[in-house]
């Protein structure tokens, strides 16, 4: 809801909107300085505030749904635990151009928001890491970053080792490591296994021979490593995801950033 327009019962409407009977206090809830005219209350809304704790498999559609529930009212998201997107293909936090709010305030309280890590390749390139924030509302998105914003690390490159040209007669699919965080490991067919990324580190590539290895996954904001070997098909690692992609927000505090940003 919002305070009614002029003409209308602005005083009672402002009290219902803000929960404040004193108009000086209602003005504060509506982000107006005192003194002010009550007519300035018309059409304004109090901030809608949400707080989120840790979730390592988070669907960013939740943010979008809360924005549309609030209508044109300004909305505040307080992040108090590490958040990781559920998919490398979906940004953790996305504000498309049709977002209706007066502004969107994102406060990060000493924690990290992550795009998901890219997958390691299986006789193929590593996939790109996921973006953390996609912003298409320009300065209406206000970011106060008291923690970190991290693009997902790229997946490591895989390959195919044709060992028959050496003194061995085996052929191996070589897998790349998953990017940080939680990028899946690439497939492999021999030697030490490739590993997935975790919240705290990137995965490593498989290793079928002393000089043959899949690329390691990238750390947050970094590309994955390339396949290393002397024969067979060799592929590169995936690119890092963006910390913030799209249009530039209003940066109230940039904080720690891992990966490209606008």
From Swiss-Prot:
Q: Where is this motif: GRM 5?
A: 183-187
> Key word Methyltransferase present in the record?
no
Q: Where does this chain carry the motif GRM 3?
A: 151-164
Q: Where in the cell is it found?
A: Virion
How is this protein annotated for GO cellular component? virus tail, fiber
Motif GRM 4 at which residues? Answer: 167-180
Where's the motif GRM 1? 115-122
Map motif GRM 2 onto the chain. Answer: 124-131
Which residues does this entry assign to the site Interaction with the fiber protein p37? 9, 22, 37
Question: What keywords tag this UniProt record?
Answer: Host-virus interaction, Viral attachment to host cell, Viral tail fiber protein, Viral tail protein, Virion, Virus entry into host cell
Q: Where is this motif: GRM 10?
A: 231-242
Which residue numbers does the motif GRM 7 cover? 200-207
Q: Does the keyword Transcription regulation belong to this entry?
A: no
**Which residue numbers does the motif GRM 6 cover?**
188-194
Give the protein's biological function.
Receptor binding protein (RBP) that is at the tip of the long tail fibers and serves as the phage recognition site for the attachment host receptor. Probably uses the host receptor OmpA.
Record remark on domains? The N-terminus is involved in binding to the fiber protein p37. The C-terminus contains glycine-rich motifs (GRM) and mediates the host specificity. The glycine-rich motifs assemble into a 3-layered PG(II) sandwich domain.
> What protein family does this chain belong to?
Belongs to the receptor-recognizing protein gp38 family.
Query: Protein name, please?
Result: Receptor-recognizing protein gp38
């Amino acid at each position: 809801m919002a305070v009614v327009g002029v003409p209308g019962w602005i005083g009672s409407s402002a009290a219902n909107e803000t929960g404040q009977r004193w108009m000086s206090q209602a003005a504060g809830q509506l982000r107006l300085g005192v003194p002010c005219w009550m007519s300035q209350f018309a059409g304004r809304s109090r901030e809608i505030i949400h707080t989120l704790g840790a979730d390592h498999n988070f669907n960013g559609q939740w943010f979008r749904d809360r924005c549309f529930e609030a209508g044109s009212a300004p909305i505040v998201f307080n992040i108090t635990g590490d958040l990781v997107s559920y998919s490398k293909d979906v940004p953790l936090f996305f504000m498309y151009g049709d977002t209706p709010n007066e502004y969107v305030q994102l406060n990060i309280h000493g924690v990290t928001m992550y795009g998901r890590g890219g997958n390691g390749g299986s006789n193929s390139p590593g996939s790109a890491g996921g973006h953390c924030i996609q912003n298409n509302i320009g300065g209406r998105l206000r970011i106060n970053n008291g923690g970190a914003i991290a693009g997902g690390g790229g997946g490591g490159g895989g390959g195919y080792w044709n060992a028959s040209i050496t003194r061995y007669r085996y052929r191996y699919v070589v897998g790349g490591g998953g990017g940080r965080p939680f990028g899946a490991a690439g497939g492999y067919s021999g030697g030490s296994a490739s590993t997935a990324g975790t919240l705290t580190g990137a995965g490593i590539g498989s290793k079928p021979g002393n000089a043959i290895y899949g690329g390691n996954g990238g750390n947050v904001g970094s590309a994955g490593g390339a396949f290393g070997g002397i024969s067979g098909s060799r592929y590169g690692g995936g690119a890092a995801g963006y910390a913030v992609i799209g249009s530039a927000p209003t940066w109230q505090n940039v904080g720690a950033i891992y990966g490209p940003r606008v």
